[in-house]
Amino acid sequence: MKPILPDYNNAGVLIIGDVMLDRYWYGPTSRISPEAPVPVVKVENNEERPGGAANVAMNIASLGGHARIVGLTGMDEPAKVLTETLNSLKVKCDFVALPEYPTITKLRVMSRGQQLIRLDFEDKFEGTNPELVLTRMERALPHVQAVILSDYAKGALEHVEALIAKARAANVPVFIDPKGTNFEPYRGATLLTPNMSEFEAVVGKVTSDDDLVEKALGLIEKFELGALLVTRSEHGMTLVRPDQKPFHLPTQAKEVYDVTGAGDTVISVLAASVAAGKPLDEACALANAAAGVVVGKLGTSTLSTIELAEAIHGSRDTDFGVIAEAALIDAVKAAQAKGEKVVMTNGCFDILHAGHVSYLNNAAKLGDRLIVAVNTDESVKRLKGPGRPVNPTDRRMAVLAGLGAVDWVVPFSEDTPQRLISEVLPDLLVKGGDYKPEDIAGGKEVIAAGGEVKVLNFEDGCSTTEIIDAIKGGRG
């Protein structure tokens, strides 16, 4: 399965769980301490990153989704750093600040790419009033399409059963990254994402794929779960659902450098994809591709839609094919930053013919990258009348994406692509026919941004309408 990126800008996700601050100290080591047989690190720089549930929220935001987060913190400097960092990424924070507790902080000392020691500053949050989290959840639920419960067994999800019940009552799916050997508190969840070690800690040693599926189905029935996604390290991941065939996904990791936060990435991409309208199996394929990227990075890491697109389609930009608007905007910025000239055109392209192919080839020669914006079915119907389009949007886009001249294909639902063009801002806007440049939709915006508008001629004797008429007349 090669999934298509959704528009994560349509995804609202609420994250509730154990938030923490990950701190890194970096420096070289050249000697052993005279005080004890340990290396001496000369600290030269440092870094601070949101971790735990906060890393999940960062992942949602980096994809372009709308993340809201609820968690427990202290009233201290790490809490301030967490909030400011997340707010800068447009994550809406609604933390419960408890002065008697420290904000969970993990300090890692790094040298030559290796972690020498980790120091944890934390106390488990216990006996907190469940209403502190539940009321914050109630405020957020009307604004989201998915809920993630990120459990690191630090106390934020002490009342997880009530959180699941409240989300399900609102018909919002609940995705949980579980912790520990007891899955009873997660009863009724939409999906759990245990790794293999966590899964085997609950069900015992797994001897084969069939054994994994059988044991997963047992857990699903016992705890009334919607599904289980077991992440299996070098063996990829397996999605198990009742009354459906298991869905096995091989790993896409090329090099494993650091698995820190990989589980956060899996559940965030999974939930965001479902929130954006993807079916569960396709959302899992996207999450699997994302995991293959982040394990090649150091520490708790996020990924962009560009990195996710490259993981799915390969590193060559020309393989992007069909792409969501938000991902396209990022792709165009990346291409322009490399000095590439981006050309854009648009049309219905209902029945692709030689005239279309010739036109697109000529457009592609004017730059380094070619975008084709395609009218959706409803847009075509408004423009062309009943009976059109002959081919639905997904098929028209798939055919265009298969042309060597075309780099990206993106749909638009309006009568004209003016809004889309004003967001993308290509270097050159091209239109076929006898238009005047100033009359082309989006042309003014492109020119105002320093771009160009150009009109190309269509090949004579090629017309979609004529082809349709010929078929109807039995002459084709």
Swiss-Prot record:
GO cellular component, one term: cytosol
EC supergroup of this enzyme: transferase
Region (Cytidylyltransferase): 344-476
Region called Ribokinase, residue ranges: 1-318
Keywords for this protein: ATP-binding, Carbohydrate metabolism, Kinase, Lipopolysaccharide biosynthesis, Multifunctional enzyme, Nucleotide-binding, Nucleotidyltransferase, Transferase
Enzyme Commission number: 2.7.1.167, 2.7.7.70
Pathway the protein takes part in: Nucleotide-sugar biosynthesis; ADP-L-glycero-beta-D-manno-heptose biosynthesis; ADP-L-glycero-beta-D-manno-heptose from D-glycero-beta-D-manno-heptose 7-phosphate: step 1/4; Nucleotide-sugar biosynthesis; ADP-L-glycero-beta-D-manno-heptose biosynthesis; ADP-L-glycero-beta-D-manno-heptose from D-glycero-beta-D-manno-heptose 7-phosphate: step 3/4; Bacterial outer membrane biogenesis; LPS core biosynthesis
CDD domains associated with the record: RfaE_like
Binding site for ATP: 195-198
TM segment ranges: none
GO biological process, one term: ADP-L-glycero-beta-D-manno-heptose biosynthetic process
Active-site residues per Swiss-Prot or TrEMBL entry: 264
Reactions listed under catalytic activity: D-glycero-beta-D-manno-heptose 7-phosphate + ATP = D-glycero-beta-D-manno-heptose 1,7-bisphosphate + ADP + H(+); D-glycero-beta-D-manno-heptose 1-phosphate + ATP + H(+) = ADP-D-glycero-beta-D-manno-heptose + diphosphate
Quaternary assembly: Homodimer.
Task of the protein: Catalyzes the ADP transfer from ATP to D-glycero-beta-D-manno-heptose 1-phosphate, yielding ADP-D-glycero-beta-D-manno-heptose.
Similarity comment text for this entry: In the N-terminal section; belongs to the carbohydrate kinase PfkB family. In the C-terminal section; belongs to the cytidylyltransferase family.
HAMAP family assigned: HldE
Name of the protein in question: Bifunctional protein HldE
